[in-house]
């Protein structure tokens, strides 16, 4: 039986802490109708597989990720999708596109936009105001060491992400 799976780059504690500190300075962060995501679960989704078989997806990712290099990333800026506040991701050195393309499901047509979902909210949540307040954020840079295959389950306060597999990334010279 399949489980809900996706691949992602985890956000390291230093980058998450810097963004949390910046959010604490934002007056709009106290808006009603705002639901924060758990910073310990912050990640950059690379590929979403829906209901899938963990062993088969692990084998597929092992082949697809072999020899790929890790770019240097930074959380910077913010934006809004309908009902979602996200932190932007910039590439400081290297390239993220080859990594994202390698793990995207076959036939995926949506454009990849690297981001971290920070909060969700309804019409009174002030997401646009928060995105504006976070526009100047520039967190510390990091080079991801691994891609995670994560299982997503519904929890009482939001999704719960559990690592299924880990895939080490090569280290490119800067």
Regions found by a protein language model. Name each.
Residues 1-174:
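Histidine-dependent nucleotide/RNA phosphoesterase domain, centered on the 2H-phosphoesterase fold
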């Amino acid at each position: 039986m399949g489980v809900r799976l996706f691949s992602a780059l985890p956000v390291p504690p230093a980058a998450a802490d810097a963004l949390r500190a910046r959010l604490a300075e934002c007056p709009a962060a106290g808006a009603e109708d705002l639901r924060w995501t758990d910073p310990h679960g912050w990640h950059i989704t690379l590929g979403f597989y829906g209901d899938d078989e963990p062993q088969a997806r692990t084998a597929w990712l092992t082949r697809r990720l072999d020899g790929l290099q890790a770019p240097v990333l930074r959380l910077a800026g913010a934006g809004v999708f309908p009902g979602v506040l996200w932190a932007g991701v910039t590439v400081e050195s290297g390239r993220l596109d080859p990594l994202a393309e390698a793990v995207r499901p076959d036939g995926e047509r949506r454009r990849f936009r690297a981001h971290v979902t920070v909060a969700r909210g309804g019409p009174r949540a002030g997401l646009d105001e928060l995105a504006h307040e976070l526009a100047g954020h520039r967190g510390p840079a990091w080079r991801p060491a691994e891609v995670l295959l994560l299982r997503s389950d519904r929890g009482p306060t939001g999704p719960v992400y559990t690592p299924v597999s880990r895939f080490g990334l090569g280290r490119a010279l800067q």
